[in-house]
Amino acid sequence: MNWVEFSSDAFIAAFFLYCFGFMFYVIAVAGKKWSNRDPERHVKRWARIAYIVSALGLLAHLTFFFTRWIGSGQIPTSNMYEFMTFLGMAIMIAFIIVNAIYRKPVLGMFSLPLVVLIVAYASVFPQEVQPLVPALNSIWLKIHVTTAALGEAFFAVAFASGLMYLLRVVDFKGTSKKARRAQRWVEFTLYVIVVIIAFIATVFVFRGMGYQASFTQELVNIDSRGVETTTVQEVDYGMPPIFKPYNSEVVEMESFLGLSKPLFETPSWMEGVNAGRKLNTIVWSILVGSLLYGLLRLV
């Protein structure tokens, strides 16, 4: 086993420790109302357990970071996978610092899910070590990316604190215009969070199923001199195609819940690399997220 493979194991360990830390914070906050319990003693005990488990998760995450650095020979912030893993680690560092100051278990109940979400989102991206472009092989990459992520991490903890505050002070039973406006914005924020969770879950589910669809897309480009060039490329989908690429034909498509062919074609004005696949991913995320949010509202 080389350093990069070992770092992947440490990353998985960090993810599960963060999940357990979150569950223990929930027990610390919600469990104080259980019968035959001293609420203050219960909160203190489980908050300490949650903090220790979360700190162990951070230790495993730091192990991932430095062992991947050793194995790759470069600081692991050079692609989206590495940056998002570093951002998750930075958020955890920020939480550890803020929690050491204020010692509020409810902050852990809101911050840990954010860390889990970022870490899970990182796993969506390719995990191979990629060599740095020579222009980026500079000390400024280490300084700029890491300090930017650390700054964003404290904003992330502030977001968790702000959301916690809003859920506490907004009057969800109020009928005034001001109360209804506050309710709508809080619900919109929660809806966006659920859609992001749905995106990550959908990617993992279809990836686990091994789903794949392929299209051949014909692209026509006219340069400044009026010369027309046509290129044909293959586009692969990891989710059932609700929207197929513009001006494309199906090469291979597995049926899913009766969906044996794309329902729509991506509009021609949507340009960019893999525009159709990105639109399809957004639509799936909104559909699944809306379903999850509707179920949560029913509960």
Describe each model-derived feature in a short phrase.
Residues M1-V299:
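Polytopic transmembrane helical bundles with strong interfacial aromatic enrichment
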